[in-house]
UniProtKB/Swiss-Prot annotation, chains A, B:
This is Arginine biosynthesis bifunctional protein ArgJ. One of its GO terms (cellular component) is cytoplasm. Belongs to the ArgJ family. The active site is at 188 (nucleophile). The record marks 187-188 as: Cleavage. Pathway: Amino-acid biosynthesis; L-arginine biosynthesis; L-ornithine and N-acetyl-L-glutamate from L-glutamate and N(2)-acetyl-L-ornithine (cyclic): step 1/1; Amino-acid biosynthesis; L-arginine biosynthesis; N(2)-acetyl-L-ornithine from L-glutamate: step 1/4. It is an enzyme of class 2 (transferase).
Amino acid sequence: MFDLFPIHGGVCAPEGFSADGIAAGLKKEGKLDVAFVHSLFPAKVSALFTTNRFAAAPIRYFQGLGEVFDCNFVLINAKNANAMTGAEGIEDIEWLMERLKHRFPSLVNPVMSSTGVIGARLPKEKIEASLGEIVLGKKEGARAAQAIMTTDAFSKEVAFKVELPDGRSFCIGAMAKGAGMIDPAMATMLCFITTDADVPENRMKELLQKAVHTTFNAISVDGDTSTNDTVMLFSNKASGVYEEEAFLMALERVMHKLATDVARDGEGAKKLVAFEVSGAASEEEAIKAAKALTTSLLVKTAIFGEDPNWGRIASTIGSSGVECDENRLRISFGEVLVYDRGAILFDKTIEEKAASVMRQESFKIHCDLGIGRGKFTAYGCDLGYEYVKINADYRT
Amino acid sequence: MFDLFPIHGGVCAPEGFSADGIAAGLKKEGKLDVAFVHSLFPAKVSALFTTNRFAAAPIRYFQGLGEVFDCNFVLINAKNANAMTGAEGIEDIEWLMERLKHRFPSLVNPVMSSTGVIGARLPKEKIEASLGEIVLGKKEGARAAQAIMTTDAFSKEVAFKVELPDGRSFCIGAMAKGAGMIDPAMATMLCFITTDADVPENRMKELLQKAVHTTFNAISVDGDTSTNDTVMLFSNKASGVYEEEAFLMALERVMHKLATDVARDGEGAKKLVAFEVSGAASEEEAIKAAKALTTSLLVKTAIFGEDPNWGRIASTIGSSGVECDENRLRISFGEVLVYDRGAILFDKTIEEKAASVMRQESFKIHCDLGIGRGKFTAYGCDLGYEYVKINADYRT
């Protein structure tokens, strides 16, 4: 066993990592809009990216360098996704990275990550002009987390110290952005994780894949998959300590915290809902049903209206394509059972109890399909007027 | 070849069909809420139903009678879906149908169709008490179309006379409802088609399947599939005339008109958009991409905002899982090309032209994937404040 302690510092918490946010004039009013994460020690990087076929230029640039490679620096910009920009998008990154390496000769294979407008060239000159403000050793994780925000209502960071039974320890830190856009682009999710654990480089990608399955792949704000979605893990081995079970658990905790923060901070959203599906024929079927619930417009608007509309829950499961049977299905809001294998328990009393569950900021809706042992929990949010406003009225 | 003339009368236009709407007290203020369609001559019925696993009781009742069978009457009610009601839901229908046959001995295998709240018992006594108002011979198609409306902003009916080159003719008529609900239930689509063409009974289901593919299966209001979706075809052979090509064409025209009316009348929607996808690797891929566009929240809110946000269109195609390549893709709003195989044509002038296309009530967005010959057109609508209001605020 091991102990896990929340600590301050975000991506700068692990030994040897620095980060900061600077203002390059991409956002208005001198707001922070460019961030970097740097390791003072040699580090390895591995990442998982969007499945969108039109993966943005920074993703294709990263993939050109390999799966896991030496890298001690990532430059992140808001306001421009550098997506649908073709070969020029890559050239713009190469141009910037050359200037960055010229200015900071200690950088090894610097990479980029972007979020913002799709289909416009990267404002590389503006970014280049701001590189002079970068001080590599700055430990300003909170400013970095702030710089990468777009329509995020709050910045998202987390860090843990992991103590093994023999007293040795390592740290893991991370920051993320989600929410969406204020400009016409897709809602992009970016997450940067740092650790001083001595992670074997051939394990980095697989561990990321394991952890993303129940965290970032389990959330949905609007069901769309951006051209820029990225989860990036930097490991500099500075602690010299590693224990896989402990590291994976800590990685999952970090990613779970940030993923639920991203869902909670869905554009205009006020509520975080955990859709627990159990009793499915398989885990795949549980995933299918749980994700159908997170993306159903009728379910999302019912959550916004704090309406325990179990008929919409049932119908969404029925149309999700999974094996189900109305005489085996059970539906609960929190601990309030409203439908029990063919019996409609929903009366005025139960309705009021279920509605009071939904008035909370965070709650669960549980569907037991009663078929098999497959289970999965997906996280979603409500959809209200603010969502429409953010996504339709950005011009005004 | 043949000629097709629009005529009045809706479902009552074909010879020997009658219909009416009555008020059973299910809706408030004495509004019409129960409808029937009847054939004075012996008729056959065939239907296509929802793929939702929790198909409503009236659907399971119908399926218990066969695929194509003798039937000269359908009773339709609004305000209650009779879904998630188990064996009792079927018993309620049997009870009502017995009373109906007792009152009108000429009825053969009467069936039901319902739309409204999921998970509440059918108010069968109220409906039974109103059966006395039914006059079998009434030709009030418009009142029937009105009775089946829920949140529909307008009633939907259509009829054509089909004239063959030799002067013989037959008629086809139909009515539909869509839009959604004012009560907490799924947005249900119901469509009833009548014809006096001499359709061979063994062709009825296949012809319905062909016609539904490019019509009702090509529309999306909210991406949810209701427990009650139904397309029902009655044929009484009264004209003695049939020519398959002409009949199929007329059937498709009727269903296309009603399906686009349903999409146009999506809850709170103001615009009908045809998403034309061409150049896909296969028709399946074209369907996948076109449907992804109709259900993308970011695309739907951009349409509401009249924002020619081609980046969202591209990204939705990229995440739809179809084969695509940014150097082959072309995107147009109406006739305005905004992205051409890697070249971003979008400047202030093009943006204004594309925005003016989007200010129309009805327009197309065309995506040529440039990969193969697969094509498909799906129909969708915008998503604005009204949608949220209808679906979240029904209590207030």
